[in-house]
């Protein structure tokens, strides 16, 4: 059986474990950096400390790479005259399709959205009057084309305010469904990393929630290089694998942006690259496959450069990591661009060869999730369960607001 068939035939039931509800952290600790930290070096022993120890446990000359995306207030509620409430959950921009542009629109825009209670939305627009920046604004939502379980929704409004300010005024932070609670006022701060500044995600890159300005400053003191990238996290991050084998599970495409300067730093890195969170892992590892396409097709278009789900398992890896990264730099230079922007659908599962990172900081993930597959691919199929058993036996808190892990090769 070849590699891709082996990977596609992985049974998701092999990545199940018992997770009692009381082990799921419903809120973060008052002091983020006080959370517990499980450390594991592949082939070594498990140890534990606290997140404020991260600057001390990172290897010498490490490069810490984190995701600077910011969670948007993506949930909008419209109350109908009949009394029923329709919830619209903005997933990704359609028109304009550029994240920065769509937030700055001042009259209309279209998003791909999930619609809650859609059976109550028979026809016609939904409207509501809202207060935005001291102005009374009429916001209208029109339902368009259906795409799978989502709809294209066109929003239109008056008053000359931006769509970003509308979301800030009436939108809600979309906390994960497995918290089994509604959004609270504290989530608007708790569910953002201290370094988030690029609007676009509908879920936080939660490994970064533990960082404080003080922890980052201590990293600087110890000579740890800090760099950032962008992956806008989609709702697919909450989606469990429902098929028996992972080959039947389809990953969502997500927008990524990587500065040319980071690519150059990765090429010249003297120490290990440590990714903060699975979103940073997937973005960094996707770069190798972008560079691999450019090796044979230097003038590849956006579609050809999109990293597909099974690409790592079906394409021979014949060039070095540095060559792949240099190909991306050269591509940017030919196009006079300062950042690579594209999409990734990358699935990392056992059988995947990590090419760029040699360490990751991450949380404890849901049973039977693609994120658990990613961790298993890094620490080893035989070791992920021992790590999770240890965490369950030693009172670690799980999922988005829970405790953290540091894994290194």
Could you say what each language-model-derived stretch is?
Residues 2-409:
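Surface-exposed, charge/polar-rich loops and edge strands
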